[in-house]
């Protein structure tokens, strides 16, 4: 099942891009792009012109950031960020923000990878109105149960109360673990897109609750001081704050 009645359109690649060194980052980016193109009717989402492709310096290393943003009937913003720092570090960040008219959780995934290993790989569907819906708890359970196969599961940060009981957060050391993270990510993403295709608009009172929940999600994510510190070092504090509030975790209106 796909969103709307028209045939899905492929995503148009941005003119400027980065080439991740770690294969898991490339594989996950390709999965996100292809799945969005398969399930969703995509329209452009316009970022400020100076924030789509960004270059800076971080402790002598070149920092390059490329953002791709789209929207659809159900999602107000589909954001994929790819970044490289120097010759050895890759970062992937993705959030799928539903429109507040639809009672859906927020899909998010991040990878931080060096050439040797993935120090952090996370995927989740974060609830915005109470608990994660029963359909999601049940639908994600078979894939979530496999997270015990990771050798090193990680603890969530103190501000991570926004994440769900189905959150997978691990270090990825071996090719087998990389395949496992891809399989879990694919299952989560496809399940979410299938649920989105069936989503119907909610009443005004429920929409207000969803809007408040999405704002809380963004406010909690904005507390990630590590992201702010890296961006401030590469650019400056004012730029970092604008980028976080405009590109990464903008509050829905």
Curated annotation (Swiss-Prot):
- For this protein, what is the EC number? 1.3.7.5
Q: Which cysteines are joined by disulfide bonds?
A: none
Sorted alphabetically, which InterPro entries does this protein's record hold?
Answer: Ferredoxin-dep_bilin_Rdtase (IPR009249), Ferredoxin_bilin_OxRdtase (IPR022870)
Main EC class of this protein? oxidoreductase
Q: What Pfam families does this protein map onto?
A: Fe_bilin_red
- What does the record give as the reaction this protein catalyses? (2R,3Z)-phycocyanobilin + 4 oxidized [2Fe-2S]-[ferredoxin] = biliverdin IXalpha + 4 reduced [2Fe-2S]-[ferredoxin] + 4 H(+)
| GO MF terms held by the record | cobalt ion binding; phycocyanobilin:ferredoxin oxidoreductase activity
Q: Has keyword Glycoprotein?
A: no
What UniProt keywords apply to this chain's record, in alphabetical order?
A: Oxidoreductase
**BP terms from Gene Ontology:** phytochromobilin biosynthetic process
What family is this protein classified in? Belongs to the HY2 family.
The task this protein performs is described as: Catalyzes the four-electron reduction of biliverdin IX-alpha (2-electron reduction at both the A and D rings); the reaction proceeds via an isolatable 2-electron intermediate, 181,182-dihydrobiliverdin.
Query: Any idea what this protein is called?
Result: Phycocyanobilin:ferredoxin oxidoreductase
Gene label: pcyA
């Amino acid at each position: 099942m796909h969103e709307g009645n028209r045939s899905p359109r492929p995503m148009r690649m941005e003119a400027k891009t980065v080439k991740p060194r770690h294969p898991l980052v490339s594989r996950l980016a390709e999965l996100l792009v292809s799945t969005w193109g398969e399930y969703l009717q995509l329209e452009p989402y316009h970022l400020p012109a100076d924030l789509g492709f960004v270059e800076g310096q971080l402790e002598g290393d070149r920092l390059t950031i490329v953002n791709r943003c789209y929207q659809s009937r159900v999602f107000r913003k589909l954001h994929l960020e790819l970044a490289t720092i120097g010759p050895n570090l890759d970062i992937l960040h993705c959030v799928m923000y539903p429109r507040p008219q639809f009672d859906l959780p927020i899909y998010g995934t991040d990878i931080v990878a060096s050439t040797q290993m993935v120090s952090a790989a996370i995927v989740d569907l974060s609830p915005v109105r109470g608990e994660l819906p029963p359909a999601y708890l049940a639908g994600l359970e078979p894939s979530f149960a496999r997270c015990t196969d990771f050798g090193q599961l990680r603890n969530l940060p103190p501000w991570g109360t926004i994440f769900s009981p189905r959150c997978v957060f691990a270090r990825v050391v071996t090719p087998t673990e990389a395949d496992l993270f891809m399989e879990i990510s694919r299952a989560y993403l496809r399940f979410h897109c299938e649920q989105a295709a069936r989503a119907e608009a909610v009443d005004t009172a429920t929409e207000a609750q969803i809007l408040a929940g999405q704002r809380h999600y963004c406010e909690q994510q904005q507390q990630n001081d590590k992201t702010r510190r890296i961006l401030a070092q590469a650019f400056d504090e004012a730029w970092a704050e604008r980028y976080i509030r405009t590109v990464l975790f903008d509050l829905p209106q």
